[in-house]
Curated annotation (Swiss-Prot):
Annotated protein name in UniProt: Small ribosomal subunit protein uS15
Cited InterPro entries: Ribosomal_uS15 (IPR000589), Ribosomal_uS15_bac-type (IPR005290), uS15_NS1_RNA-bd_sf (IPR009068)
The entry's keywords: Ribonucleoprotein, Ribosomal protein, RNA-binding, rRNA-binding
Positions of transmembrane segments: none
GO terms for biological process, alphabetical: translation
Amino acid sequence: MALTAEEKQDIIAKYATHEGDTGSPEVQIALLTKRIADLTEHLKFHKHDHHSRRGLLLMVGDRRRLLDYLKKVDIERYRSLIERLGLRR
């Protein structure tokens, strides 16, 4: 269910803007997107898990705020990330 260390490192390596980058908006959004996808799959089988559903909604809100920030700061990085992650916007 949770991200393994290997999965996390793969995502960080794929979306990092420079060596050792773990906090850029791109990396944070990519990690949240993976967690959101995993939790969405969990909720398909456990429809009454309302505690996890609330966590999912909080993560979606966090990702939305990070995407809005990235869009405001650098629209080209935003468009590139949306395309790479396959998010609708």
